[in-house]
Amino acid sequence: MLSYWRQYLAISPFYLIFTVFSFGPVFYSLYLAFQRYDGLGAKQFVGLQQFEFLWNDPVFWLSIRNTLLIWVLSTVPTLFGALVLATLLHSVRRFKGFYRIALYVPNVTSIVAVAIFFGAVFSNNFGLVNAILGTVGISPVPWLSNPWLIKVVIAALMTWMWTGYNMIIYLAGLQAIPTSIYEAAKMDGAGPVRTFFQITIPVMRPIILFTVVISTINGLQSFSEPQVLFASNAANQNMGGPGQAGLTTLLYFYQSAFLLNDYGYGAAIVWAFFVLIIVLVVINWRIVQRGRKS
């Protein structure tokens, strides 16, 4: 290995720059979490005071509840829908490439454009959904003013964007399963439903675990969705809508750090949220691993 020191020396500037610009801000944010800093004046060390205030901050816990509920409402249908679509697409013989691209397009579409589209579709007064409901005699639904429906709309937006991404991953896993396994199951009299739950799901467990972890991380990082969704209302743009029903933790971090210039408190928010994400990822991992062993 030492014989290649010249080669390592040649590529070392890239890794040094990468380390500085990647891990430097991470450690600096941890440093800020123990400081009171408004971005202009001198920093003041306050120890764990930021985290103590965070623990007693009702808005922080509201943002945590909103984030977790949106995560559940989006992750479950996303993964289930992706697995169903991948299974159906796996059995398609014609136009498979077209369907694959069409279902994946939402994931590469600008999240701002998608949020604006959903805001127009679910608008309380002029939305497409309420217009359709009106044709069958149903009164307009307050999609963007009801606390629960706000979360449903944000979850639907995230589901629409990420289902295709997970579907591609599941489809790759399905294509790697030998056809001989399905042929043997068919000879034993197993129907499609039994084959799906007793063969496809067990074989796909490692891939499902991967998508659960990735979806957990992505689902908990919702920020642009509620911000852009309420961008037309200046009073609610960075508050998560009426009653802060769509205020996610990252949106609260943005509000605290960049709108109120409380960078120390903003850093404390993201580090507390980082710990929460790690805990949830570990719990998901344990649950899936336990199911795999059983």
Regions found by a protein language model. Give the residues of each.
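A structural signal for multi-pass alpha-helical bundles of membrane permease subunits
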Residues: S3-S294
